[in-house]
Structures are given as structure tokens and as C-alpha cells.
């Protein structure tokens, strides 16, 4: 996984061609903004959106937001997008319709070349892969380990359900979401998303239910298409205060155990082994990331 910090609880899609949405994106409370060149941009306006994206990214970065960009699919002009949008303001590229590890490697190679040509930090632009076809499921492990630049993966629920001829429901999407989460964890990258349609932004009780399922699966954040979804994602993907307290206490006891030469120890009635420690470390890293982003937005 690249050095880009990627514990984003909420990633809000904003059409790259709609200036009024871009101007207010920093007010929405999302951890990151995804300037979209794909589904939300009409074909006739894609070229204009592509040209406008670098300036929009710089504007949003200056306002304290982490900025990503979703390019078009590789078959739909995605490589041309990369040639225009790659800039110091871009934290990561969201790659839609990933069907194979080769898709990831092709984009990673282009980014490596562009970083070198433009004097950008090597590996500074990460990748997030969207899995949007049932045919990609058998290749999840290959995709997840395709490049050190890959930060995480997410199921694209709408297109995925079309490919599988099924309804976009928590019951139908739980299984494939779990497969994505498992593949991410095996590869050491982060799983994003929740098992439901992201288009249902008015049904907040259903959203809460689906995001709670995602949290139980180990997801760390999710994409959203409407500002109304942001607060729910931020709340439910934030570590609870009691969990933060538990993790801090556990790590303090770990330090004591090491100082005393103890290899194993118990904390609050439970034996602690390396996986428990790793989970506590990730939880505290997520907590610190959310505090940093809150401070950055307050500063701006």
C-alpha cells in the first residue's frame, strides 16, 4: 500500500463539470471529494470536465479536502483522462470497472511515467479500484495485489447488480461485499463501501443499517453521491469513544508487558495476541486520521 493516507470515512462524488457543486464541496463535511469524470458527466461535456479538473482539485485541496478523481473506464477514455488530470493536488485515482489485475497495472504504469515527467512525488497518487462486474469476483486477489499504488477496493453496487441480474439490496450485496473485504485484507489494502445501493440517499434509516453491516465487515469508509449521506458515514465509520479508550489501554498494557519481558498478557479478561494488537493499531490510526481531517477543515 502506498504512503498516501487513505482512512477516508466518506468520499463524496462531485461532477467535475458542475462548478457550483465544486465550490461548495468543502462545506459538505466529507473526508475526501471525488471529482467525477465518469457516470455523472454527460458524454458531450467529458472533455471540458477533464480540462477543468486540475484547477478544481487545486482549489479543493487549498480548502483542506483530500481530492481524488474518478476517471472513465480504460475502454472509455480513462488513459486520456490521466494525461490531463495528474497533478500535485490529486491524492488518488478511482478506477472504475476493474476486471483484472492488468487494468490496475496499466494505470499504475501511466501514473509512474507522469509523476516522473512532471516532477511529482513518486507513488504520491494512489489508486482505488471499483469492482463492478460479477466476472471480476474470481480475480479479486490478483486485483488487490496488482500494484503497491493500490490503496483499496470497493464494490460498485449498481453496475455489479446489473451484471449479476439481481436487486441492489443488503441481502444480495452482503456476500460479494464480504469477498471484496476479505481480498483487501489478504492483500494489506483497505476495503471501502457498504452492501446496498448508494443511490438511495433519502432513506437514512436504511443507510444506517447498511453502513453498520459494512462496519461489521471491516469496511473503513464508503463512497457517497449526496451530501445527506456524509454525516451517517462519518458517524458510523468513526471508531466509538469506548473502542478508542480500549485500544489505548491495550497498547499501554502491551508496552508494560514488553518492558517486563512478558510475551503474552491479558487485558480486561482477554488474552492479547498479535491480531488483536494490529486491530487496535488500525483503529487508533483511523481515529487520528479523522481528527486530523476535522482540524484541517476547521482551519480553512
Residue ranges and their predicted role:
Residues 1-300:
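Expand to "…catalyze enediolate/carbanion chemistry for C-C bond making/breaking, isomerization
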Amino acid at each position: 500500500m502506498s504512503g498516501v493516507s487513505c482512512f477516508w470515512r466518506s468520499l463524496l462524488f462531485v461532477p467535475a463539470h458542475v462548478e457550483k457543486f465544486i465550490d461548495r464541496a468543502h462545506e459538505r463535511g466529507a473526508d475526501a471529494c471525488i471529482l467525477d469524470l465518469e457516470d455523472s458527466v454527460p458524454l458531450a461535456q467529458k472533455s471540458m470536465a477533464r480540462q477543468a479538473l486540475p484547477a478544481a482539485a487545486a482549489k479543493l485541496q487549498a480548502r483542506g479536502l483530500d481530492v481524488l478523481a474518478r476517471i472513465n473506464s480504460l475502454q472509455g477514455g480513462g488513459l486520456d483522462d490521466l494525461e490531463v488530470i495528474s497533478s500535485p493536488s490529486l491524492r488518488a485515482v478511482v478506477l472504475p470497472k476493474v476486471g483484472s489485475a492488468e487494468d490496475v497495472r496499466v494505470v499504475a504504469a501511466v501514473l509512474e511515467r507522469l509523476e516522473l515527467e512532471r516532477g511529482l512525488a513518486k507513488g504520491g497518487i494512489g489508486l482505488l479500484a471499483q469492482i463492478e462486474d460479477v466476472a471480476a469476483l474470481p480475480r479479486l486477489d490478483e486485483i488487490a495485489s496488482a500494484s503497491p499504488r493500490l490503496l483499496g477496493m470497493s464494490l460498485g453496487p449498481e453496475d455489479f447488480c446489473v451484471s449479476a441480474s439481481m436487486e441492489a439490496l443488503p441481502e444480495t450485496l452482503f456476500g460479494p461485499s464480504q469477498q471484496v473485504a476479505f481480498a483487501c485484507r489478504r492483500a494489506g489494502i483497505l476495503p471501502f463501501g457498504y452492501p446496498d445501493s448508494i443511490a438511495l440517499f433519502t432513506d437514512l434509516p436504511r443507510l444506517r443499517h447498511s453502513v453498520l453491516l459494512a462496519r461489521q465487515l471491516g469496511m473503513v469508509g464508503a463512497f457517497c453521491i449526496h451530501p445527506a449521506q456524509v454525516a451517517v458515514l462519518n458517524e458510523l465509520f468513526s471508531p466509538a469513544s469506548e473502542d478508542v479508550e480500549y485500544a489505548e489501554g491495550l497498547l499501554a498494557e502491551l508496552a508494560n508487558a514488553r518492558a517486563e519481558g512478558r510475551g503474552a498478557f491479558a487485558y480486561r479478561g482477554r488474552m492479547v495476541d498479535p491480531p488483536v494488537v494490529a486491530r487496535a493499531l488500525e483503529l487508533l490510526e483511523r481515529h487520528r486520521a479523522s481528527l486530523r481531517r476535522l482540524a484541517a477543515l476547521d482551519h480553512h
